[in-house]
């Protein structure tokens, strides 16, 4: 079952770079590198490219793109300043309902395919009461929903 939905954000470690205009950031002379996870390997990378296409901004990142093998490496490119901005998971830079550092813009979820976070109970664990309780917690608990929201995830529809 899907217990959460990932959210994409255009983020920068520079607290003043990202406002609410993706095009302005990507076309800025100050942005020489834009980090994106490899879309062949990472759902957030695919979502980033879908967003660029939806907004007609594919050309804005030509020659500026730095591909990360995964979303963790992509975050590191931006966090360390090796890329001025990047498309990362909101959960990487968000805590208690706000950005931990830097600046970001949460990409509207209608611009990319849903990034589902799924949980399963393996056959080996079907008799494990702790595992069953944890899955029930993820599915039914208001506390679990509050935790997901606080750390930048959406709730599955």
Residue ranges: model-predicted function:
Residues 1-157:
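Exported/periplasmic ABC-transporter solute-binding proteins
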